Regions:
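Acidic donor-binding segment of Leloir-type glycosyltransferases
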Residues: 17-59
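Glycine-rich, basic loop-to-helix element that forms the pyrophosphate-binding segment
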Residues: 60-76
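Conserved donor NDP-sugar-binding/catalytic core segment of glycosyltransferases
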Residues: 93-125
Length: 267
C-alpha cells in the first residue's frame, strides 16, 4: 500500500514544503502541486525537493486552493492519498496509523482522522468513537489535512467556488467535498486517530472577522441542507453563536452565502 501525500502550495510556500517531508520510506511518496503566477517563481523550488526521489513537483499556473487540490488529485498515483498544506508535519507513526485504518476498514473510500497542534494537543474537540460521515454528530466538521482517500478516478472534484482564492466563499471546500463524495455513493467514515500536526487556526476560524467566511458558512449549509433547510440554521446560528459583532450583520452575510449557493446551482 503506497501512501501519497498531496502537498498544495503557492508562491514562496514551496520553500516551506520541504519541511513537510519525513525521512524516506518505501511506502510513502509526496506530490507537490505548486501554483505560480509568473515563471520567475519556478526558481523558488528548493534543491531539497528536487533531490528527493520520493518527491514529484507539479507546477501549474492557476489560482485557488480547490483548483490546486484538484490538480494534485489528477496527478496522484498512490493507493491512499491525503491532503496537506505546507505547514503540516508528519511522523512515520502517522503513516502507520493511516495504513492500519484503511486495512481495518476495507469498505471505506474515505477516512477522516484527527489533527493535533504542534504542541501535541488536539487542534479542537474530536468525537471519541468512529462513525459514518453520512450521519455526523452535531458540531463535527473536517479539515482538509484530516482527509485520506482510497484513490479513485471517479471521486468528485473540490468545488472551486469554495476555498481560498475563490471570488466569494473563502472556505468550506472540505465539507462540500465530503458531502459530494457521500452523495455519489462513496463510503466515508471518521476514525479517532491522530495523523498530522498543523497550525491551530484555519480560515474558518475567522468567522467574526471576514464576511467571506460568514458567506461560506451559509453556502455550506445550503449545499448540505438545501435552500429552505439552510434558512432556519443560519438564523439559529446567528442567535446562539454570534457574539462580539452584530447578529444581524452575521445573518445577512450568511444569507448572502445561501443565495450565492443557489445562484451557482448548489441548492
Amino acid at each position: 500500500m503506497i501512501i501519497e501525500v498531496l502537498i498544495c502550495t503557492i508562491g514562496r510556500g514551496i520553500e516551506k514544503a520541504a519541511e513537510v517531508l519525513t525521512l524516506p520510506r518505501n511506502d510513502v511518496r509526496y506530490l507537490i502541486s505548486f501554483q505560480y503566477s509568473d515563471s520567475s517563481e519556478l526558481d523558488y523550488i528548493p534543491d531539497k525537493l528536487k533531490s528527493r526521489k520520493d518527491v514529484h513537483v507539479i507546477s501549474v499556473r492557476s489560482c485557488g486552493l480547490s483548483a490546486n487540490r484538484n490538480n494534485a488529485m489528477k496527478h496522484s498515483t498512490g493507493d491512499i492519498i491525503l491532503f496537506a498544506d505546507d505547514d503540516n508535519r508528519y511522523t512515520w507513526k502517522d503513516f502507520d496509523n493511516i495504513a492500519d485504518a484503511f486495512e481495518n476498514n476495507a469498505y471505506a473510500d474515505a477516512i477522516c482522522f484527527r489533527s493535533a497542534t504542534y504542541d501535541g494537543n488536539f487542534s479542537r474537540e474530536f468525537p471519541s468513537v468512529s462513525f459514518e460521515l453520512c450521519s455526523p454528530p452535531k458540531g463535527y466538521y473536517v479539515r482538509s489535512c484530516e482527509i485520506a482517500l482510497r484513490r479513485n478516478s471517479k471521486f468528485p472534484e473540490f468545488d472551486t467556488n469554495f476555498g481560498l482564492g475563490s471570488d466569494v466563499l473563502a472556505c468550506g471546500e472540505e465539507e462540500v467535498f465530503i458531502h459530494d463524495l457521500i452523495k455519489q455513493g462513496f463510503k466515508a467514515i471518521y476514525c479517532p486517530v491522530t495523523i498530522v500536526c498543523t497550525a491551530a487556526s484555519t480560515t474558518g476560524s475567522f468567522f467574526f472577522k471576514k464576511s467571506s467566511v460568514r458567506r461560506s458558512k451559509g453556502a455550506v449549509l445550503a449545499v448540505i441542507h438545501g435552500y429552505w433547510g439552510a434558512l432556519p440554521r443560519i438564523m439559529k446560528y446567528a442567535l446562539f453563536n454570534v457574539k462580539g459583532m452584530s447578529r444581524l450583520s452575521a445573518l445577512h452575510d450568511m444569507y448572502c452565502g445561501v443565495v450565492y449557493a443557489k445562484k451557482i446551482g448548489r441548492c
